[in-house]
């Protein structure tokens, strides 16, 4: 694709185009990281990018960058064409979509798929080999359901969703539109509900459901459980990494982002635009406010107010955690001094 064509496409995107300086309208074949990019490749560079030192050594034919005079001056001296936008990362994401077309799966239902007679599949859907769709399930239009996926009874799947291979969607689950569910994820399995009595565990039936709104993306090997009654709810725009566990009856707001190995226990309520870093744990029935950020391995045992940044186990305000951490490594020395004082 000619560089000028890419510029036109970026102009129509969401990265907030500023200007383009094209020294040669070269054909861009693909994209690469700035430290390994070659001729006919495009890359991107942000102001705080740790790869900025590689700029003088790159062979990239074009760079997407921000409106930074130092970077633009260096690019001009190196005769490297550049596209200037407010958000280079978004522009680069759009370029990847332009340059690398998805493998096209023609609409149709594979002969090996099993679709129960009361189930309905909409227009322009791809249903791959060995897919199972249960009784009374309704599949909307333009969905891609990849091989080995099991969709049990009374499921509602909206339009334009992608369900990758070997997912399991349990009965009564509802997934709206434009969602992506990656491989081996299980949605709507039984919540972990047992009642202790006389030294044994009595099972609490899990008869609720899972509701997932539009534009949600869920990574591989995630588990989203249904509750005994009511629903587990994930609002629109939320994104989950791999190996995330969502317990029964959890409510998650809009546009949240959860990194790998996050675990949220039953009944917790997560607000909008919450960021949970890797291995964060959230306790039962805890309420986490809007715009909260929790750093990795954080243990959230009590409610967190809107806008807080928390760290540590148990979670505390990040500034308090940093102060505590600085003291922690001095504890052996402090303990030694205390023993010496005791002897006096």
Curated annotation (Swiss-Prot):
Active site: 248 (proton acceptor)
Keyword Coiled coil in record: no
One Gene Ontology MF term: structural constituent of carboxysome shell
EC number: 2.3.1.191
Biological process per Gene Ontology, one example term: lipid A biosynthetic process
CDD domains cross-referenced by the UniProt entry: LbH_LpxD
Keywords tagged on the record: Acyltransferase, Lipid A biosynthesis, Lipid biosynthesis, Lipid metabolism, Repeat, Transferase
Reaction(s) the record says it catalyses: a UDP-3-O-[(3R)-3-hydroxyacyl]-alpha-D-glucosamine + a (3R)-hydroxyacyl-[ACP] = a UDP-2-N,3-O-bis[(3R)-3-hydroxyacyl]-alpha-D-glucosamine + holo-[ACP] + H(+)
Pfam families per record: Hexapep, LpxD
InterPro entries referenced in this protein's UniProt entry, alphabetically: Hexapep, LpxD, Trimer_LpxA-like_sf, UDP_GlcNAc_AcTrfase_non-rep
Highest taxon above the source species: Bacteria
Keyword Transport: no
Pathway(s) served: Bacterial outer membrane biogenesis; LPS lipid A biosynthesis
GO terms for cellular component: carboxysome; membrane
Family: Belongs to the transferase hexapeptide repeat family. LpxD subfamily.
The protein's role, per its UniProt record: Catalyzes the N-acylation of UDP-3-O-acylglucosamine using 3-hydroxyacyl-ACP as the acyl donor. Is involved in the biosynthesis of lipid A, a phosphorylated glycolipid that anchors the lipopolysaccharide to the outer membrane of the cell.
Complexes and interactors: Homotrimer.
Protein name per Swiss-Prot or TrEMBL: UDP-3-O-acylglucosamine N-acyltransferase
């Amino acid at each position: 694709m000619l560089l000028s064509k890419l510029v036109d496409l970026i102009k129509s995107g969401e990265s907030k185009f500023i200007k383009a300086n094209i020294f040669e309208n070269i054909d861009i074949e693909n994209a690469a990281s700035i430290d390994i990019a070659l001729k006919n490749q495009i890359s991107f560079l942000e102001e705080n990018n740790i790869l900025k030192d590689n700029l003088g050594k790159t062979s990239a034919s074009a760079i997407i960058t921000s409106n930074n005079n130092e970077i633009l001056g260096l690019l001009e001296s190196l005769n490297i064409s550049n596209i200037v936008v407010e958000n280079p990362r978004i522009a680069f994401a759009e370029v990847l979509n332009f340059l690398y077309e998805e493998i096209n799966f023609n609409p149709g239902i594979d002969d090996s798929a099993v679709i129960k007679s009361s189930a309905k599949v909409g227009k322009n859907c791809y249903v791959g080999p060995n897919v199972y769709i249960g009784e009374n399930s309704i599949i909307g239009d333009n969905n891609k359901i990849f091989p080995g996926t099991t969709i049990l009874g009374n499921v509602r799947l909206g339009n334009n969703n992608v369900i990758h291979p070997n997912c399991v969607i349990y009965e009564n689950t509802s997934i709206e539109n434009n969602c992506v569910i990656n491989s081996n994820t299980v949605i709507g399995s039984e919540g972990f509900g047992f009642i202790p009595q006389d030294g044994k565990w009595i099972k609490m039936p899990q008869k609720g459901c899972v509701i997932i709104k539009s534009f949600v993306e869920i990574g591989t090997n995630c588990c989203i459980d249904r509750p005994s009654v009511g629903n587990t709810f994930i609002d629109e725009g939320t994104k989950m990494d791999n190996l995330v566990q969502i317990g029964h009856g959890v409510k998650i707001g809009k546009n949240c982002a959860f990194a790998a190995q996050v675990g949220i226990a039953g009944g917790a309520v997560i607000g909008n635009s919450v960021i949970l870093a890797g291995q964060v744990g959230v306790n039962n029935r805890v309420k986490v406010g809007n715009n909260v950020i929790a750093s990795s391995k954080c243990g959230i045992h009590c409610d967190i107010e809107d806008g807080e940044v928390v760290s540590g186990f148990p979670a505390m305000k990040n500034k308090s955690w940093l102060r505590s951490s600085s003291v922690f490594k001095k504890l052996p020395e402090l303990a030694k001094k205390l023993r010496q004082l005791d002897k006096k």
